[in-house]
């Protein structure tokens, strides 16, 4: 018996940069969350894996202009943690300044709330501007993954302006904008 297999080759679109605008805020990402290894890398970022941080930083660095200032988005503990590690790694490639300008209240994570079928509001996150930004630079808020965009939107609202740059973006925000 002879078995034949058919191989279908799809064009590679993995890790193509994404740019979308939602509620007047620009979101940039290195690729879709569910493409290739992005989901795995995103989980490793949350674990603080140095190789994942370095990989994500190199990808995000390609998206940023020379006049950017990196602003890590604070996590559910109210302070920057994983996003600061990522911002430092990005800065090591780009030499862009980092300003720890945002704080928030300690809260449940957006990820955990979503698993319960809930979404945190801007008020739940309690973001506020903690430090001033240089006036000659454009703020780029750094996040690991953007899903609904609600966290980033609340952070930008607190800062007053900025663009969001993330490693991966889920289809949730993209489907809202189609």
Task: Please give the residue ranges for each predicted region.
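A phosphate-binding catalytic loop at a beta-strand-loop-alpha-helix junction
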Residues: 142-155
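A short, conserved beta-to-alpha structural element at the edge of catalytic cores
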Residues: 153-157, 161-178
């Amino acid at each position: 018996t002879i078995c034949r297999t058919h191989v279908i080759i799809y064009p590679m679109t993995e890790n193509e940069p994404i740019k979308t605008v939602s509620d007047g805020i620009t979101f940039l990402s290195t690729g879709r969350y569910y493409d290739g290894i992005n989901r795995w890398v995103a989980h490793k970022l949350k674990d603080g894996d140095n190789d994942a941080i370095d990989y994500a930083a190199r990808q995000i660095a390609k998206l940023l202009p020379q006049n950017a200032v990196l602003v890590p988005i604070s996590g559910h503990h109210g302070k920057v943690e994983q996003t600061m590690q990522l911002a430092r790694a990005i800065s090591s490639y780009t030499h862009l300044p980092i300003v720890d300008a945002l704080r928030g209240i300690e809260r449940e994570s957006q990820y955990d709330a979503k698993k319960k079928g809930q979404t945190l509001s801007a008020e739940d996150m309690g973001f506020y501007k903690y430090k001033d930004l240089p006036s000659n630079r454009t703020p780029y808020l750094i996040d690991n993954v953007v899903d609904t965009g609600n966290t980033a939107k609340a952070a930008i609202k607190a800062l007053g302006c900025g663009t969001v740059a993330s490693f991966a973006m889920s289809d949730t925000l993209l489907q809202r904008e189609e």
